[in-house]
Amino acid sequence: EIVLQGRVSEFFSLTELSSTRLVTVVDTGVDLDTETPADEAIPPDNLSDAYRFWERREGMRFHLDANSHVVAARDVFASTQDGEVWVIRDDHPIANRLNPYERLVYRDPHPLDDIGPPGSFDNGNGMRILLTSHGLKALSADNTTLIAPARTYDTITNALTGSLFFAFGKYSIEVEQQPILVNGVDPALNAPPLTAVDGVEFATSDYNVENLYDRRDDPFDGCDFPGNLGCPGVNPPFDYVPASEAVYQAHLTDLAEQIAGPMHAPDLLMIQEAEDQDICTVTAGAMDCGLTNNRDSKPDTLQELALAILDAGGPTYDTAYDRDGADDRGIVSAFMFRIDTVELLPADAEDPVLGDSPTVDYRGTALGYNADVSNPKALNADLPDDVDLDTGFDGTNVFTRPPQVGHFRIWRDGIGLSVFTDLYAISNHFSSTPNARVGQRTEQSAYNVAIVAALDSAGAGRVISGGDFNVYPRPDDPFAPGEQYGCSPLPCSIGPSDQLGPLYVAGLHNLWDTLVAEVPQSAYSYNFVGMIQTLDMQFATSDQFTDLVQVRAGHFNADFAADHDGDVARGASDHDPQV
């Protein structure tokens, strides 16, 4: 026991004693648990109050009663070799809801949030408690030790103790005991997708496959593989390359089993985060890779995924993309489609979007590749000068990952037989971080509207615009009504930001609205810092929306532990698809 003297100050958001000196040593050999018993981890529900609760106790030991409830599956951060699990106390009302699938922490505007009328912004959900691995690493003398692979709805049956730590803007309890886990309900059975009826219905899906890169070193790409020198905007290390061929194959297998299994093999998938590399083609049912760039205008990883789907008992898929849609590090959006039901139509020079004179009426100057005749086709434009960039931006174009527009014919009874439906699909991957790049993301919505308007003017009534929009559906928003943001420089903008507003105003129907009305407990696609949220959506024109039979989210990723081999076809991505 010692007495110190110093000045209390803040340094990089940490409260510290500076200019500290030792005054005296009062005692030695003190039993820590006797003299300073662990405080109870009972944070207030209000987020601001919860921050004060934790900050006042920074560095102190905490006790968490047995039977705490997991609200976010274990996440793992490779850069720090750390894992984290978010929980709430077992005596919190959320943990005791009658429907076990509602025992989640929903963002404030969600209908199943803990308080307030639906759509309101209220307490910020301060009841969340973060458990991390540093204490376990210290006790095991092994810096690779991770906290147990909890999944959402698990119960931690043992009591936990640990010291309070602050890093990356979060307070966490560095637990000294491994959580003992008992599984709750299976997240994958939370209102899962159903099978489309052959010959009567067809299914579309969005799917962010989370950095689906292979282990091939693309000789035509300077930022593709460890040891490459880098390229403009991208510097080593390239941590999106899988650690081994086995890791890559496991990623493919998990995705394939999901698509062939609980997703029921949708007719058309709008894919995000595939690698743009194209040095391979499929020959006799196997990958044939060489030293020819742009080998067959199909992304290699998605061709390999199509083979894995076939191995998993699914149908045969083909894939297509426009490589102009890739960003600097090689991420691209694309399409996968069943060859027994879906036909990718030939590119038409007269097409209002895919042709050589697209009629996309947008106020920014179109990029040169917009005039290419291609199906699918990436489209982009210069970012207009008047866009508010106070919250940041990516580059000088509207998109860093341009949307892919594809024209498909969906046949009821096989290609070339009977009745068909023509559909335009737009695969989107908007700029990341909902509370940043606000002006740019709003323009990305407006550009989608311009594409749909061009198609509508030409009589193409059926359009689906889907993907990872990286912001929330109405009424959710990164900024509450009246909240100031983007204040550097002044004047501030005032919330809500309504970044998807152009899509709603144009009359497009967000299928999430149907999902949340029918199965609100299942209306989400992502889990961030212990709160579920929706980033992945599909917007439909009225002609397409009229025929909607069902929309469901497949919860076999966001609720399952990362880097855990014990879950088959679970946790293959950090996003859940909608079907």
What are these regions (language model features)?
Residues 1-236, 251-253, 356-402, 441-444, ...:
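Extended non-catalytic accessory segments flanking core domains
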Residues 3, 61, 65, 250, ...:
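Extracytoplasmic/secreted proteins, especially bacterial periplasmic and envelope-associated proteins
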Residues 4-13, 19-27, 67, 71, ...:
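Sec-exported extracytoplasmic/periplasmic mature domains
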Residues 9-12, 23-24, 136-137, 209-214, ...:
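Solvent-exposed loop/turn segments at secondary-structure junctions
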Residues 12-15, 214-216, 277-287, 296-298, ...:
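Extracytoplasmic/secreted cell-surface and envelope-processing proteins
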Residues 58-62, 125-127, 200-203, 329-332, ...:
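Residues that flank catalytic or metal-binding motifs in active/ligand-binding sites
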Residues 124, 174-334, 340, 370-395, ...:
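N-terminal, active-site-proximal structural segment of metallo-dependent hydrolase catalytic domains
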Residues 148-166, 170-172, 177-191, 339-402, ...:
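Metal-dependent phosphoester-hydrolase catalytic domains
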